[in-house]
């Protein structure tokens, strides 16, 4: 993968930079997060938030959403052209929670988008700092991935709800650029493409005229992004077929669903980045930490170290378990919603439980929830070890894909086997190997059948002590081979509704 020479690292995508050396990358990522931090501090001043209120993750999310909305040009233009009752297209806002007489109060605030844009630019040396905005989008996306299930979205596009581990980044907005594309799972890309093809089937003008030409370019670009995620020649060849199709229809949808299923074993490369809430960067900047001088990386020790020293609070509903709320946010911070629970538990140093066993709902609080009974507690976001985030699917020895699990997309580069039920997955591949992609389908099925769940992925890779910032002594954990590691097992989470 890395030998292609044209690949930019995530940090380059993240900061919109061209090829840079490691020091420059660390500096530009540092510049990006310190801009987020400075913006957050300024917003806390504007809103007169106390130190405690500024550390409340719900307030952080509201402030993040405000700046994302202020810069959402396409939506802003749409809102101005289609005025809806009670929505001022020039304003943005949300709930801010304040502590009053021992109780939490909700206050709805409203700001001019222009004013928010001014504060953001001022915090980012007068620039638009799109990279910082994308970073916030990815943090929200990672939080959604850990919190909600996408069963309905999967079923609607004709995919199997058990393919949830392929859905990383499914709630990312389209404007999230290259950094956003890098973190999208195979299932997310397939779903976007299927939606597009279905529109083309239902609307004859979709591919026609000047607009249709732009649509076609977008379609081919999405196909290429997905192709780049696959690691075997047969999967890539099938993507070429889908991309080159004269007018994409049901045959292409079939091929895409086939490819998505195959990705449960022949996993795609999906990037993982630790994107933290704005308040965490704000706290660090306020305490005098110079991100740009020190440098920062989203895939190394830095986010772990930052979380070791940050105290973040969260509102807790009456029957929620604060430890479970902490787990949810920890997973979101490290983009670990689709990681093997054995690996996450080892790194975190406390047991990470499947979502079906969590007594907690999402982090955000609906406007109709009763604030009288709300409490708050400290989120435990520290870890026992740290590990390097991966951008590969953990397939063993390059071109040959290894065992995958019906619900794992590795986040950490740590040696483990990837347990999976081959029977369950292979059952989805009965029959249909005819048509123009038959030889590729046969080849893909052959590779999947030869995969063994005893195979070890990320051979020799381990976790590191938090004192080992240069990653010199890997500690290779040994896992119980038989143990199931799926977060979505026995799931009862809410659906994601936009």
From Swiss-Prot:
Coiled coil: none annotated. InterPro entries: Flu_NP. Transmembrane segments: none annotated. A motif (Bipartite nuclear localization signal) lies at residues 198-216. It comes from the Viruses. GO terms for cellular component: helical viral capsid; host cell; host cell nucleus; ribonucleoprotein complex; viral nucleocapsid. Belongs to the influenza viruses nucleoprotein family. This is Nucleoprotein. It comes from Influenza A virus (strain A/Duck/Ukraine/2/1960 H11N8). The lineage of its organism: Viruses, Riboviria, Orthornavirae, Negarnaviricota, Polyploviricotina.
């Amino acid at each position: 993968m890395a030998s292609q020479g044209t690949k930019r690292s995530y940090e380059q995508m993240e900061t919109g930079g061209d090829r840079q050396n490691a020091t420059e990358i660390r500096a530009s990522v540092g510049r990006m997060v310190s801009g987020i931090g400075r913006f957050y501090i300024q917003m806390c001043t504007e809103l007169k938030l106390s130190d405690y209120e500024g550390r409340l993750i719900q307030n952080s999310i509201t402030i993040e959403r405000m700046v994302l909305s202020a810069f959402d040009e396409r939506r802003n233009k749409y809102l101005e052209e289609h005025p809806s009752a009670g929505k001022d297209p020039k304003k943005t806002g949300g709930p801010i929670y304040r502590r009053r007489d021992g109780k939490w109060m909700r206050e709805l605030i409203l700001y001019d988008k222009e004013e928010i844009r001014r504060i953001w630019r001022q915090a980012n040396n007068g620039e638009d700092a799109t990279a910082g905005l994308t970073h916030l989008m990815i943090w929200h996306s990672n939080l959604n991935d850990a919190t909600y299930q996408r069963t309905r979205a999967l079923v609607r596009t004709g995919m199997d709800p058990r393919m949830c581990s392929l859905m990383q980044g499914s709630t990312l907005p389209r404007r999230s650029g290259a950094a956003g594309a890098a973190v999208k799972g195979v299932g997310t890309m397939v779903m976007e493409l299927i939606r597009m093809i279905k529109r083309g089937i239902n609307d004859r003008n979709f591919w026609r005229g000047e607009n249709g030409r732009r649509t076609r370019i977008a379609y081919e670009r999405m196909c290429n992004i997905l192709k780049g995620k696959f690691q075997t020649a047969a999967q890539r060849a099938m993507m070429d077929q889908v991309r080159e199709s004269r007018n994409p229809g049901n045959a292409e949808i079939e091929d895409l669903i086939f490819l998505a299923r195959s990705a449960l074993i022949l996993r795609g490369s999906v990037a993982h980045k630790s994107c933290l809430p704005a308040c965490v960067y704000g706290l660090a900047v306020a305490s005098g930490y110079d991100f740009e001088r020190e440098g920062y990386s989203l895939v190394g020790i830095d986010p772990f170290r930052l979380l070791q020293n940050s105290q973040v609070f969260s509102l807790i509903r009456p029957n929620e378990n604060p430890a479970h709320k902490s787990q949810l946010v920890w997973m979101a911070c490290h983009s670990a919603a689709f990681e093997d629970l054995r690996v996450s538990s080892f790194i975190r140093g406390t047991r990470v439980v499947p979502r079906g066993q969590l007594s907690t709902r999402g982090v955000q609080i609906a406007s109709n929830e009763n604030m009288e009974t709300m409490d708050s507690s400290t989120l435990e976001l520290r870890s026992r070890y740290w590990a390097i985030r991966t951008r590969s699917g953990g397939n063993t020895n390059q071109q040959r894909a290894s065992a995958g699990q019906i619900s794992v997309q590795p986040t950490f580069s740590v040696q483990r086997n990837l347990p999976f039920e081959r029977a369950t997955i292979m059952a989805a591949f009965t029959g249909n190997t005819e048509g123009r992609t038959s030889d590729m389908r046969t080849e893909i099925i052959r590779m999947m059948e030869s995969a063994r769940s005893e195979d070890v992925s990320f051979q020799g890779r381990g976790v590191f002590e938090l004192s080992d910032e240069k990653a010199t002594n890997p500690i290779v954990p040994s896992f119980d081979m038989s143990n199931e590691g799926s977060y979505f097992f026995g799931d009862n989470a809410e659906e994601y509704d936009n």
